[in-house]
Amino acid sequence: MVSPDNRPGTQGPSASAHAHDSRVPRKRPGSWDNNPSTAGNRAVKKRAVRACVSCRDRKVRCDVVNGGPPCTNCRLDDVDCVLKASNRGKHNPARYQARSRLSSNATAPRAPSPSDNINTDADTAAPGPAPGSASATVFRSDHSHGSVATGQPQERRGSQSVAHGDEETICDDDENENNSWHNQQEAEQTRIIHDSQVQPNDIVHETHCEQQPQPQPSQGAATRSTPSAQPANPQTSDYLVALAFQGFYALGWTEQDATEAPPSSSRMDNVSASANTPHADQNHLPLYISPHPSHLDKHDLEFLARKDCLTIPDNQLRDELIRIYVFVVYPFMPAIDLVDFLEPITGSSEVGTVSLLLFQAIMFASVTFIDMQLLQRYGFKNKRAARQVFFNRVKLLYSLGYEADRLTLVQSLLLMTYWYDSDSDEKHTWYWMGLALTTAHIEGLQRDLEEPQQMTKNGRLRRRIWWSCVIRDRLLGLGLRRPSRIQEDEFSVERLRLDDFDISLPPPPAVARLLAAPSYTGKDPVNRQRMANLCIDLSQLCFTIGRILHTQYTIASTPGAGSNYLRRAIVRPRSLKEQAHSFAKCDADLQEWFRSLAPESRYVPGARDGGAAAAQVENSTIRLHKILLYMKYLTAIGALHRPQVFYSGSDSIDPARKADSRRKLTEAAVAITKLAFDLQSNGQMCYAPTSSVPAFLSAALIHLLNIRSPDEETRNISIGRFCQCLDALHQLQSMYTAADEAVHIINNMTENAGFILPLLGIGNPMSKANGIAARNSRLFSAIGPSRVTTAYPSPAPATGNLDTSQEEMISAPIPGAGPTGVALTGQRSRQPSAGPNMTPSATPNLMSIWSAAGNIHSERDLPLPADLMAGIQLDLDAWYNIGDIIDPALMNFETGLDFLNS
């Protein structure tokens, strides 16, 4: 075989036109020397005009020009002979016009012709692709047939095809032009000058966000494009390229020329027009978004554009989503610096930018709580469809490694934990929480910084991010019945304090105008301090929740018999002996937490603050988070005392302790029902998080048990409370898949238990589907649509249908209340009613609904099971093996429903 160093080659046809270069490397002895040089007695020869990719990489001489492809080297080595387009001379024709016009004002520039890019050395030329594209052809050698196979062409820029019989080669374009390194430098300088000319506050590039949209930059939007993007306006491109190479004064640029330059809006009009097609350059981002990372190539960015990941909501939708995030999501997850995030968006700062991954994560976390009418204007059918679209953007950006900063990754992953679609989706809440904690540990957030750095801006942010991880981990463990990942002895970060929150200095005016609540985010720091205290109280509650999960529950060791759920359960209650030494301590910790709450952090039923419109907005927001904090406390009570009530093991439980746990569990269910009424009456149910679903389900199932009570008064009151919780779950169905599963659990249990509730379509001769439709039509027609249309919770309660005595009972403190803040229904006086005998404080809105429905006018109209009419006492421990049905249902929605029918 001929060695690579001695293989034949040919001299290029234009060898006489090239000057000798003293930098030509010395060739080995025995190599071909067609052009010897006398200088230094060194054998110097000219480079071949063309070389295939393989020979170029190996730095050996190629004879593809003489013999045609495949070359001798590729033929002997049996490799593909790939001819690649020359990187020289790939200039945009518009640049030639700019340089000609700016260097000589006497003559007009010549318009480029299609023949400018065709190599004059070619004998025969075939029509090639349009300017701006090219092909690289692969020639495969086939020794068995002695033929050459042509591979798939790959798109490139600025070359033409030349036909050679059945083979297609690529000819060089303008051999005398600058090389590719100069072209890259020109493109980079052009981008820098382009960015410097467009001010951040000129016009914001934006796109309308639809359910399956293509990114469409709005008219007149100033954007940042990738270096691969080609200017859409030739005149503007001429000026920018010439400016990058020669400068203002070298070009003789005058103020008159500047006035004749096209404005940025016209430039972006052309870009918008070209962005409507899937394959157009759609990589434009607003100036407040950080540039694309360098490791993503053109194909990655095109993929992200096709997948809608680069779509930025327009100003109206974006601002509303930001307000939702600040008022609803941020207070209990203060994992970002609000001012640093909002200043670039509002134009208050020209220095910072926002990570695209974090921006899209915030948009996703907020879209759940936005008004449905606004989403429908953008083409979304429901909130679930909007959640899917917004989450897909964040997931693809993360999967492609778009963001490299670990702090930003933790912030984004925490927001991604709001995603839960179904149990079949392996990448749901638990998965993203694990990634967030892993990244946080890699970044070292579990350890405090050194003393001088703790109180810096970055130190406070790191501490808030870590405690956001702790809070989220505890709440997910409580709601998903999973073991919490963070152990108390595995981190050394101090507890949150007010100094960790930026509450002293007011934000810039533009940020305050965006949030539209000056006293909440502006001059008066009192309300910001109250919100920070609520977050601190939640972090302290999560300490106790963590102890409950660690001491009262354990990893399931063996699958349960006959239950699909138990085969998949992660934790189950411990035995009574294991619980005994820690149960009393956890119960005391919960009561101590509740007693130590400051008065401004304590939820008072029916208490509402009035005042100016701005004060109503902020007070309503603070009240919303008081309700959510109280609901999490009640859910923790249920997780602690439920195993005591529904324990079915062989160990005997103290009757007094069991009775006390049953009382507290019922109190918690009653209190959660009142919270549901408060949220509905204020129009704030649309802001309830996913953690409210297990809370309402827990309360509904406790009321469902009390419906079978032999006491008529308790039974009728429990029906109203059950309806209130079920109605709340129905409202949450438009937001969360978990609410669907919770309603499904309740429907199966009521059918299996043989309940007959005509109002809810349960137990009627009609079909199940008709019963559900009848129930929904009656309930929701009486409630009517939500009054909330923006991010500002409505402070006005819907109490027009209540009389004075009912209002007093709602707002009056309950004497003798237990640790949950409410007393049992049987321990206080009630007012008689013509309908089902419910306390007005329990569900007064359901009374008006039932009255309007006209189905139930007296106690005799409600069909009841015969055993209850006979006064048979219900044994909670024996009813449908309640320990294996209700307890899993209250704690976990990641389960099938087959066990309900077993």
From Swiss-Prot:
Major location category of this protein: nucleus
Compartments where found: Nucleus
Induction remark: Expression is induced in response to 2-benzoxasolinone (BOA) exposure. Expression is also induced in response to 6-methoxy-2-benzoxazolinone (MBOA) and 2-aminophenol (2-AP) treatment.
InterPro entries in UniProt: Fungal_Detox/Toxin_TFs, Transcription_factor_dom_fun, Zn2-C6_fun-type_DNA-bd_sf, Zn2Cys6_DnaBD
Knockout mutant characteristics: Reduces significantly the induction of the FBD cluster gene FPSE_08120 in response to 2-aminophenol (2-AP) treatment.
Pfam families per the UniProt record, alphabetical: Fungal_trans, Zn_clus
UniProt GO cellular component terms: nucleus
Region Disordered, residue ranges: 1-47, 92-189, 208-234, 258-277, 820-839
DNA-binding region: 52-81
Protein keywords: Metal-binding, Nucleus, Zinc
Acidic residues: bias regions: 168-177
Gene Ontology biological-process entries: DNA-templated transcription
Feature: compositional bias, Low complexity: 120-137
Xref: Gene3D superfamilies: Zn(2)-C6 fungal-type DNA-binding domain (4.10.240.10)
Stretches with biased composition (Polar residues): 178-187, 220-234, 262-277, 826-839
GO molecular function, one term: zinc ion binding
Protein's job: Transcription factor; part of the Fusarium detoxification of benzoxazolinone cluster involved in the degradation of benzoxazolinones produced by the host plant. Maize, wheat, and rye produce the 2 benzoxazinone phytoanticipins 2,4-dihy-droxy-7-methoxy-1,4-benzoxazin-3-one (DIMBOA) and 2,4-dihydroxy-1,4-benzoxazin-3-one (DIBOA) that, due to their inherent instability once released, spontaneously degrade to the more stable corresponding benzoxazolinones, 6-methoxy-2-benzoxazolinone (MBOA) and 2-benzoxazolinone (BOA), respectively.
Protein known as: Transcription factor FPSE_08121
